[in-house]
Amino acid sequence: MKILVTGAFNCINEQLKAIESLGNQVIFMQNESDVLPCDYTWIEGVICNGLFLYHDIKKFTNLKFIQLTSAGFDRVPMDEVERLGIKIFNARGVYSIPMAEFALTGVLSLYKGFKFFCENQAQKSWVKNRNLIELFNQTVCVVGAGNVGTECAKRFKAMGCKVIGVDLYPRVDEDFEIIYPLDKLDFALSNADVVVLTLPLTEQTRGLFNKHRFAVMKDGGVFVNISRGAVVDEVALSSALSSGKLYGACLDVFDKEPLGSDSPLWDYQNVIITPHNSFVGNNNNERLFKLILENLKGI
């Protein structure tokens, strides 16, 4: 197969050679927005992230295989992929561990006042905080019980939490006390001290967390979003923070990125903002490479 690999896969020469050793021809392109280094019709497979934001998928007339370096499919014209019968794979499980660790760290940072202490350290100020909270025995609702959600559940369970889930496809899973269907979301939220979003962005989930969802959450809850920014109505979130409805929030993703300097979310003392960074981990490349080889061998 003739494969275009983009810089979205931060590969080394040995990895490209391993892909070629499976009988493939490989051509590399660093920036996905650049002019292609070959004719569209030459390409039978691509390893990419946002390539089709810049290049019309209809021009790839011989395309049979897409390997995404992202967990989400929202940067790909899935209607065309399905119509053309192209096999597509996401980076399933590649980023689950660092994202789950990030979610746990965010909640602990809020409960243990790390932002307060770090700011005092910068001022060389020795001030105690008597209002810290234990994570032990809290109920955590993970919305989206896929690979990332399951890794989150494992870690919160290990901290002594009761973990419940919400998913389009509920199932019995040892890492969750129960996984509710999506139509039970409000009930699950009303029983949770911590809510962690790990669900994908689809037309069904876009704007899912609106004014109503924040209203049904328990008073004093913690909200974590490591999924996609467009799942959340940021005006409703800001209102829930300013009213004191939420104890705090850890936000790694936003509707528009970078987050604008005029966003009120920057100004809350009880909000941790990170620049879509939760997926980063030192073992990602190794996991992604292994997954790519498995998928190539399987087609």
Indicate where each model-derived feature is located.
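C-terminal helix-to-coil terminal segments
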Residues: 87-102, 116, 256-299
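Glycine-rich adenosine-cofactor-binding loop
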Residues: 7, 92, 136-157
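Redox-cofactor binding/interface segments in oxidoreductases and associated redox assembly factors
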Residues: 47-48, 68, 196-197, 225, ...
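An N-terminal-biased, well-structured beta-alpha scaffold segment characteristic
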Residues: 1-87, 210
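NAD(P)-binding Rossmann-fold cofactor-contacting core
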Residues: 159-175
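Rossmann-like adenosine-cofactor binding region
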Residues: 170-264
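Residues at the starts of beta-strands that form the adenosine-phosphate
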Residues: 2, 25, 139, 161-162
